[in-house]
């Protein structure tokens, strides 16, 4: 599914903080321009995540196929009894706006309607529900007297009656439903992350909400979730049946490459650990280390989904050594904190539009031959 970016330039805030700890010039000496190893590692991780997201297949959700297009109202023959209908009322409608409802019902007004044409109207309403993602909402014709020229159609919004994970019920509106014993989604403590990602029990079922939930769950590499919509016990009720056999909670990695710089050493050593949904909040946590001859970088990151929102944090610490001439040793250290919020504001069959906010704060310290220079702080807000 192609992602549609939503980007907007925002504010850039500078703050210079702290006092020099020794009496030296406030400006740092000219030295080699070195890239922060932690920032480089973060960029490589973000590039890999964007590539994985772009190549991730669309959620697999099994629903009934939509009804085919039908002929015009006048082309539908009525061999039986008909009634002249001049007004059509929809009761219980909470899913179609007034303009859409009028566009569907208008062709049937001021016409003689019988069983065949009324069935066509019900089918057209169902098609309108499905087109907007309300795949379990239905329209019904209640017993009534049509001699007064008014046709009343009852709309029954499809509700989420229960949520099942691998055949076990974890949430339900049915009083006698037996809850699952312990977490079912692969976490040690809870299934809260899966419940947060999927539509809430009692809500009107909408296909885009299901797709968003499956996307949130499958953003973790250990998950390959699929969803089926099963009939519930109550009229209009549906059971969201989530099937997922998660892989390992933890992934370990170690290796070496030659992507370092000449100034600090081309050979890089890498080690990391990733934990996916270890607790049950569908959280992603990672710890990583990258080092060269003269650099070290440690990074910790965490992300937790909540419906259409994803909250994240990344912290980093990096340090480096570099010679200035033959007599001076430059030592630098950088602390970084990044808080992120991603909100999917619209999604359809063509893609999705997301709103992304990050607040980054960095503090850099440099010293030459153990003489500390004035630290520098930078805060950046991106929208």
Predicted feature residues:
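N-terminal signal peptide c-region/cleavage motif recognized by signal peptidases
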Residues: 15-17
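Periplasmic polypeptide-binding modules associated with outer-membrane biogenesis and secretion
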Residues: 22-260, 272, 288-297
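Outer-membrane beta-barrel domain signature
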Residues: 115, 203-204, 258-262, 286-291, ...
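Residue-level detector of the transmembrane beta-barrel scaffold of outer-membrane proteins
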Residues: 164, 226, 241, 251-253, ...
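Residue-level signature of outer-membrane beta-barrel architecture
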Residues: 244, 275-277, 304, 343-345
């Amino acid at each position: 599914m192609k992602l549609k970016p939503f980007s907007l330039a925002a504010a850039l805030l500078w703050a210079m903080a702290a006092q020099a700890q020794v009496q030296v010039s406030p400006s740092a000496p000219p030295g080699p321009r070195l890239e922060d190893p932690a920032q480089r590692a973060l960029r490589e991780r973000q590039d890999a995540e964007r590539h994985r997201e772009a190549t991730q297949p669309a959620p697999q959700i099994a629903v009934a196929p939509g009804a085919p297009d039908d002929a015009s109202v006048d082309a539908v023959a009525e061999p039986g009894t008909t009634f002249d209908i001049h007004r059509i009322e929809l009761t219980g409608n909470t899913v179609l706006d007034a303009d859409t409802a009028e566009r569907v019902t208008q062709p049937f007004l001021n016409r003689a309607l019988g069983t065949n044409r009324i069935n066509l109207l019900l089918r057209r309403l169902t098609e309108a529900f499905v087109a907007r993602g309300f795949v379990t909402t239905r329209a019904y014709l209640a017993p009534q007297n049509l001699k007064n020229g008014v046709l009343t159609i009852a709309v029954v919004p499809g509700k989420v009656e229960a949520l099942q994970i691998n055949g076990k019920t974890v949430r339900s509106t049915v009083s006698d439903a037996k809850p699952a014993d312990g977490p079912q989604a692969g976490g040690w403590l809870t299934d809260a992350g899966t419940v947060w990602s999927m539509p809430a029990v009692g809500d009107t079922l909408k296909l885009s909400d299901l797709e968003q939930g499956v996307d949130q769950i499958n953003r973790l590499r250990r998950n390959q979730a699929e969803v089926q919509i099963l009939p519930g016990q109550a009229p209009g009720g549906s059971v969201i049946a989530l099937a997922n056999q998660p892989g390992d909670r933890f992934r370990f990695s170690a290796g070496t490459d030659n992507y370092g710089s000449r100034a600090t050493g081309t050979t890089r050593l890498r080690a990391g650990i990733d934990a996916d949904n270890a607790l049950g909040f569908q959280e992603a946590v990672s710890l990583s280390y990258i080092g060269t001859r003269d650099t070290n970088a440690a990074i910790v990151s965490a992300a937790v989904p909540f419906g259409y929102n994803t909250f994240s944090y990344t912290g980093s610490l990096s340090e480096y050594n570099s010679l200035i001439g033959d007599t001076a040793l430059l030592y630098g250290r950088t602390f970084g904190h990044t808080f992120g919020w991603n909100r999917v504001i619209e999604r359809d069959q063509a893609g999705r539009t997301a709103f992304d906010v990050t607040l980054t704060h960095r503090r850099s310290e440099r010293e030459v031959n153990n003489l500390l220079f004035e630290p520098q702080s930078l805060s950046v807000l991106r929208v």
